[in-house]
Amino acid sequence: SLQIKNLLLYNGLMKNIIFIFGTRPEIIKLAPVILELKKYPEDYNVIICNTEQQKELSNQTLAYFGLKADINLDCMRENQSLSSVQARILTSLDKVFCEREIDATIVQGDTMTVLCGALTSFYHKIPVYHVEAGLRSYDIYEPFPEEVMRQMTSRVAALHFAPTGVNKDALLKEGIDTDKIHVVGNT
Protein backbone atom coordinates (compact mmCIF):
# COMPACT_ATOMS: atom_id res chain seq x y z
CA SER A 1 0.00 0.00 0.00
CA LEU A 2 2.93 2.36 0.63
CA GLN A 3 4.19 1.63 -2.89
CA ILE A 4 0.78 2.57 -4.32
CA LYS A 5 0.79 5.79 -2.26
CA ASN A 6 4.24 6.70 -3.61
CA LEU A 7 3.16 5.98 -7.20
CA LEU A 8 0.14 8.25 -6.78
CA LEU A 9 2.38 11.07 -5.55
CA TYR A 10 4.89 10.41 -8.34
CA ASN A 11 2.13 10.70 -10.93
CA GLY A 12 1.18 14.11 -9.56
CA LEU A 13 -2.14 12.92 -8.21
CA MET A 14 -3.40 14.99 -5.35
CA LYS A 15 -6.58 15.24 -3.35
CA ASN A 16 -9.84 13.64 -4.42
CA ILE A 17 -9.44 9.90 -4.80
CA ILE A 18 -12.56 7.76 -4.89
CA PHE A 19 -12.36 4.10 -3.91
CA ILE A 20 -15.27 2.20 -5.42
CA PHE A 21 -16.12 -1.26 -4.14
CA GLY A 22 -19.10 -3.37 -3.17
CA THR A 23 -17.86 -6.73 -1.92
CA ARG A 24 -16.04 -8.02 1.13
CA PRO A 25 -12.95 -9.21 -0.82
CA GLU A 26 -12.59 -5.79 -2.47
CA ILE A 27 -12.63 -4.07 0.92
CA ILE A 28 -10.13 -6.52 2.40
CA LYS A 29 -7.71 -5.77 -0.45
CA LEU A 30 -8.30 -1.99 -0.56
CA ALA A 31 -8.49 -1.23 3.18
CA PRO A 32 -4.68 -1.11 3.62
CA VAL A 33 -4.41 1.37 0.73
CA ILE A 34 -7.28 3.49 2.06
CA LEU A 35 -5.82 3.52 5.57
CA GLU A 36 -2.38 4.48 4.22
CA LEU A 37 -3.73 7.39 2.15
CA LYS A 38 -5.88 8.60 5.05
CA LYS A 39 -2.63 9.21 6.97
CA TYR A 40 -1.91 12.07 4.54
CA PRO A 41 -4.99 14.34 4.55
CA GLU A 42 -2.90 17.23 3.20
CA ASP A 43 -2.28 15.17 0.04
CA TYR A 44 -5.42 13.06 -0.29
CA ASN A 45 -9.13 13.46 0.21
CA VAL A 46 -10.20 9.81 0.30
CA ILE A 47 -13.79 9.21 -0.79
CA ILE A 48 -15.15 5.76 0.05
CA CYS A 49 -18.00 4.60 -2.19
CA ASN A 50 -19.80 1.32 -1.48
CA THR A 51 -22.18 0.00 -4.15
CA GLU A 52 -23.26 -2.56 -1.55
CA GLN A 53 -23.05 -5.47 -3.96
CA GLN A 54 -22.73 -7.50 -0.74
CA LYS A 55 -24.50 -5.08 1.59
CA GLU A 56 -24.19 -6.74 5.01
CA LEU A 57 -20.75 -8.26 4.41
CA SER A 58 -19.31 -5.06 2.97
CA ASN A 59 -20.55 -2.89 5.83
CA GLN A 60 -19.31 -5.38 8.45
CA THR A 61 -15.91 -5.54 6.75
CA LEU A 62 -15.62 -1.76 6.61
CA ALA A 63 -16.41 -1.60 10.32
CA TYR A 64 -13.75 -4.23 11.04
CA PHE A 65 -11.14 -1.90 9.52
CA GLY A 66 -12.59 1.12 11.31
CA LEU A 67 -13.84 2.57 8.04
CA LYS A 68 -17.22 3.92 6.97
CA ALA A 69 -18.43 4.62 3.46
CA ASP A 70 -18.91 8.26 2.52
CA ILE A 71 -21.35 7.10 -0.16
CA ASN A 72 -23.64 4.05 0.01
CA LEU A 73 -25.38 3.36 -3.28
CA ASP A 74 -27.63 0.43 -2.31
CA CYS A 75 -27.62 -0.87 -5.89
CA MET A 76 -28.75 -4.44 -5.35
CA ARG A 77 -32.28 -5.71 -5.79
CA GLU A 78 -33.65 -9.21 -5.54
CA ASN A 79 -33.41 -11.36 -8.69
CA GLN A 80 -31.66 -8.71 -10.82
CA SER A 81 -30.09 -9.73 -14.10
CA LEU A 82 -26.46 -8.78 -14.73
CA SER A 83 -27.67 -6.09 -17.13
CA SER A 84 -29.96 -4.62 -14.48
CA VAL A 85 -27.20 -4.59 -11.87
CA GLN A 86 -24.84 -2.92 -14.33
CA ALA A 87 -27.39 -0.28 -15.32
CA ARG A 88 -28.19 0.54 -11.68
CA ILE A 89 -24.52 0.80 -10.66
CA LEU A 90 -23.55 2.87 -13.73
CA THR A 91 -26.45 5.27 -13.22
CA SER A 92 -25.75 5.63 -9.49
CA LEU A 93 -22.02 6.19 -10.03
CA ASP A 94 -22.64 8.72 -12.80
CA LYS A 95 -24.63 10.81 -10.34
CA VAL A 96 -21.75 10.63 -7.83
CA PHE A 97 -19.24 11.73 -10.48
CA CYS A 98 -21.47 14.61 -11.56
CA GLU A 99 -21.88 15.86 -7.98
CA ARG A 100 -18.28 15.56 -6.75
CA GLU A 101 -14.85 16.64 -7.83
CA ILE A 102 -12.86 13.45 -8.39
CA ASP A 103 -9.23 13.31 -9.52
CA ALA A 104 -8.79 9.52 -9.71
CA THR A 105 -10.66 6.28 -9.18
CA ILE A 106 -9.23 3.19 -7.52
CA VAL A 107 -10.91 -0.19 -8.02
CA GLN A 108 -9.81 -3.71 -7.13
CA GLY A 109 -10.48 -7.03 -8.76
CA ASP A 110 -13.06 -8.17 -11.26
CA THR A 111 -16.60 -7.56 -10.02
CA MET A 112 -19.48 -5.69 -11.63
CA THR A 113 -18.65 -2.78 -9.31
CA VAL A 114 -15.07 -2.70 -10.65
CA LEU A 115 -16.18 -2.58 -14.27
CA CYS A 116 -18.85 0.05 -13.59
CA GLY A 117 -16.43 2.17 -11.55
CA ALA A 118 -13.85 1.98 -14.34
CA LEU A 119 -16.37 2.79 -17.08
CA THR A 120 -17.93 5.70 -15.19
CA SER A 121 -14.51 7.14 -14.45
CA PHE A 122 -13.52 6.71 -18.11
CA TYR A 123 -16.71 8.42 -19.29
CA HIS A 124 -15.82 11.38 -17.05
CA LYS A 125 -12.18 11.37 -18.31
CA ILE A 126 -10.85 10.58 -14.84
CA PRO A 127 -7.92 8.14 -14.53
CA VAL A 128 -8.67 4.64 -13.27
CA TYR A 129 -6.14 2.81 -11.12
CA HIS A 130 -6.75 -0.95 -11.06
CA VAL A 131 -5.49 -2.97 -8.08
CA GLU A 132 -5.03 -6.72 -8.74
CA ALA A 133 -4.66 -6.10 -12.46
CA GLY A 134 -3.59 -8.68 -15.01
CA LEU A 135 -5.29 -11.79 -13.67
CA ARG A 136 -6.37 -13.84 -16.69
CA SER A 137 -7.90 -17.19 -17.56
CA TYR A 138 -8.24 -16.31 -21.28
CA ASP A 139 -11.67 -17.98 -21.29
CA ILE A 140 -14.44 -15.36 -21.30
CA TYR A 141 -16.84 -17.84 -19.70
CA GLU A 142 -14.53 -18.96 -16.87
CA PRO A 143 -14.88 -17.33 -14.48
CA PHE A 144 -18.12 -15.81 -15.77
CA PRO A 145 -18.62 -12.88 -15.95
CA GLU A 146 -15.46 -11.85 -14.09
CA GLU A 147 -12.95 -12.62 -16.87
CA VAL A 148 -14.60 -10.13 -19.23
CA MET A 149 -14.95 -7.55 -16.46
CA ARG A 150 -11.24 -7.60 -15.64
CA GLN A 151 -10.24 -7.50 -19.31
CA MET A 152 -12.54 -4.53 -19.97
CA THR A 153 -11.26 -2.73 -16.88
CA SER A 154 -7.71 -3.11 -18.18
CA ARG A 155 -8.67 -1.37 -21.42
CA VAL A 156 -9.53 1.88 -19.60
CA ALA A 157 -7.12 1.80 -16.63
CA ALA A 158 -4.37 4.43 -16.51
CA LEU A 159 -2.30 2.46 -13.99
CA HIS A 160 -2.28 -1.28 -13.35
CA PHE A 161 -1.18 -2.61 -9.97
CA ALA A 162 -0.37 -6.25 -10.70
CA PRO A 163 0.19 -8.81 -7.93
CA THR A 164 2.94 -10.75 -9.77
CA GLY A 165 5.25 -10.71 -12.76
CA VAL A 166 2.96 -13.25 -14.44
CA ASN A 167 0.12 -10.72 -14.24
CA LYS A 168 2.39 -7.99 -15.62
CA ASP A 169 3.31 -10.26 -18.53
CA ALA A 170 -0.39 -10.84 -19.27
CA LEU A 171 -0.94 -7.07 -19.47
CA LEU A 172 2.15 -6.57 -21.65
CA LYS A 173 0.86 -9.29 -23.99
CA GLU A 174 -2.35 -7.25 -24.34
CA GLY A 175 -0.44 -4.13 -25.37
CA ILE A 176 -0.43 -2.24 -22.06
CA ASP A 177 2.63 0.04 -21.80
CA THR A 178 5.21 -1.26 -19.35
CA ASP A 179 5.41 2.11 -17.59
CA LYS A 180 1.71 1.84 -16.68
CA ILE A 181 2.17 -1.52 -14.91
CA HIS A 182 3.55 -1.82 -11.39
CA VAL A 183 4.08 -5.16 -9.67
CA VAL A 184 3.04 -4.49 -6.08
CA GLY A 185 2.18 -7.92 -4.69
CA ASN A 186 -1.09 -8.44 -2.90
CA THR A 187 -2.33 -5.83 -0.44
Label each residue range with its predicted role:
Residues 16, 103-104:
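Structural motif
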Residues 126-187:
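Active-site-proximal region of nucleotide-activated glycan assembly enzymes
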Residues 106-124:
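An aromatic- and histidine-rich active-site surface loop
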Residues 44-85, 92:
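Conserved nucleotide-sugar phosphate-binding/catalytic loop shared by glycosyltransferases and other
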Residues 9-52:
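N-terminal subdomain of nucleotide-sugar transferases
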Residues 96-103:
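Glycine-rich phosphate-binding loop signature in dinucleotide/nucleotide-binding domains
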